[in-house]
Amino acid sequence: MKNNFGTNISWTLFGESHGPAIGITLDGLPAGFQVDMEQIKADMDKRKATGKISTQRHEADEVHIISGMYNGYTTGTALTIIIENQNTKSKDYSAFHGRLRPGHADFTAFEKYNGYQDYRGGGHFSGRLTACIVAAGSICRQILKSQGIVIGSHIESLYTLSDIPFSQDYDLLEKQIFEVNEKTFAVIDDQVKYQMIQEIEKAAAEGDSLGGILETAIIGLPAGLGEPFFDSVESILSHLIFSVPAVKGVSFGEGFGFAKMKGSQANDAFHFNNKIETQTNHNAGINGGITNGMPIIIHTCIKPTPSIFKTQESVDYLSKENVNLQIQGRHDPCILHRARIVVDSVVAFGLLDLYMSRLAVKPLQGDFE
């Protein structure tokens, strides 16, 4: 099992959903950065379960930084975060141990770990571990923000309902990002918020679940981040986004829409306006895998939560018998509104790692004449 990622900055994720605690270690952070614990708490609150549209498993999610920080500043050594699991109900899972939940990692975990995996609450595969990602991602976002780089996401669509997309106008986009970052249910159009909540509540009442698409925007990035081919900006960010449970699709800019465009429509013409920029942004601020200074726009597809309360056909892995399965326990009818801060967090980590690569090279290069 590979639980770590990163080049200049690495993070290692550990723990299980129903274990005593979950945690994450960030290694390679610069020394001397003042960490805003209140901002970490605010970001954690965006991920918390709320009302009828989320799981009834409510955790305190108190973030304990046990190394790598002293007197509120990063020390430059490995920073480890621990979050205790205080509200587990493992008996909800013992009743159907071995019965494979459709859409979950139960079968694949059995095949990979030969039954030694902690299956309770999904174990290490659980979305519970994203709490650690949000805590660590908050620190990464704070460092990026100190450099003028800001990230924000909103629910672009949920089931058949759609929000207003992020604006192509930079000033309005900046305003939209700051506004959605203050919201628990992140939509630009507050009117559609209530319609979306009603759809989630309806699906929950039917014992079903919903998915949708998140739109993420990053502004303030300098040109020149990323590497050709294997460490392109798209490669790094999509790798990290796909590590978020329930993500099934990632696209940048026009994405699959390019298939219906001509080159004359898809190309972003350059012009000079105090700096070189593009007149349009179909390519989402990335050319050749490297940032061009325009906003990065990402679309992430989140599948409907696989834990539904309808009876489903399955197999008992232990007895090798066909069975009917009805899942018990506490589950989300939709995770879009909670996943948005998780996507922001993994994107922040990837960008900070790329940013540190650029800083390592830039001072060694003279100006081209």
Label every PLM stretch briefly.
Residues 1-369:
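Generic N-terminal targeting/processing segments that precede catalytic cores or assembly contacts
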